[in-house]
A protein has these predicted regions:
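The feature captures the beta-strand-to-loop junction immediately N-terminal to the Walker
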Residues: 38-40
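Helix-to-loop junction immediately C-terminal to a conserved catalytic motif
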Residues: 53
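Conserved ABC transporter NBD signature motif
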Residues: 61-69, 78
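Conserved ABC ATPase "signature" region
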Residues: 114-132
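ABC ATPase C-loop
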Residues: 153-154
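H-loop/switch region of ABC-family ATPase nucleotide-binding domains
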Residues: 196-197
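ABC ATPase nucleotide-binding domains
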Residues: 228-272
Length: 272
């Protein structure tokens, strides 16, 4: 994968009716970066991801996804370079089998059948879905449907992967598998932008934190700084920030993949 900047938002303004959601927001996500997009409910996180995928269009400013302006374009115009996991996976599942769902994108892009089969088998295996390949997605439990939608987003090896709450409802093993495939994609040079309330997952898979507050980016720094590893980072203490943003899975330090992701996320006061 090349060094083309996968995502650029410049002075973006967007709202629904009279309600301004983003106001002059600018953000760049470079190749190979893993960015955690954090913020309270209603901060505009999902709106930002929809702008990046041309599901919405800025009212002012511009959005450039993998070198292409999103203005006047549709999501399918970016299917060959970007993958998107909706917060609600049912919004993107339509095929009669898991295999057909995951194969749809590559087939639409004109891949030869052997290449499609190889890519689909690979991603289904990586996410533990191989035994579900012939099942109807809606016969599967909600967390497994999320994995199917993620497989469809990953199968084309996108340059930009956008995830909206990728670990919601997943068990320990599934969280580890998701982490592994995201890290592998980043190692190939892809950028990952993840909306998440699971700070434990973010700490293991992502390395940069962008916080949305007041309709724009208010903090942009290494995730380790946000976690309290840098004395000069002007952020509230970790737990105070976590409670305010509704984060879960908080730990006092970044550990290794297996211990953190195989521990159940902390809930209670840290929930939004």
């Amino acid at each position: 994968m090349g060094a083309l900047t996968p995502l650029v938002l410049e002075a973006v303004r967007f709202g629904y009716g009279s309600e301004r959601v983003l106001d002059g927001l600018s953000l760049r996500v470079e190749a190979g970066e893993g960015v955690a997009l954090l913020g309270a409910n209603g901060a505009g996180k999902t709106t930002l991801t929809r702008l990046a995928m041309a599901l919405r269009h800025p009212q002012q400013g511009r959005v450039v996804t993998c070198g292409r302006l999103t203005a006047g374009k549709k999501p399918e115009d970016f299917a060959d370079v970007a993958g998107y996991l909706f917060q609600n996976p049912e919004a993107q599942l339509f095929a009669r089998t898991v295999r057909a769902e995951v194969a749809f994108g590559p087939e639409r892009m004109g891949w030869h059948p052997p290449r499609v089969m190889e890519a689909v088998d690979r991603v289904l295996g990586e996410l533990g879905l191989a035994s579900d390949a012939a099942r109807h997605p809606y016969d599967l439990p909600g967390p497994t449907r999320r994995l199917v939608a993620l497989a469809a987003a990953l199968v084309g090896s996108p340059r930009l992967l956008i995830l909206d709450e990728p670990t919601a409802g997943l068990d320990r093993g599934a969280r580890v598998r998701v982490a592994e495939v995201v890290l592998a994609l980043r190692a190939q040079g892809a950028a990952v932008l993840a909306v998440t309330h699971d700070l434990g997952f973010a700490a293991e898979v992502l390395d940069r934190a962008v916080v949305l507050e007041g309709k724009r980016v208010t903090r942009d720094a290494p995730l380790s700084d946000l976690l309290g590893h840098h004395p000069d980072f002007p952020a509230p203490p970790l737990l105070d920030l976590a409670r305010r943003l509704g984060l879960e899975g908080v730990r006092p330090a970044i550990g290794t993949l297996a211990p953190l992701l195989t521990s159940p996320p902390e809930t209670g006061t840290l929930q939004a």
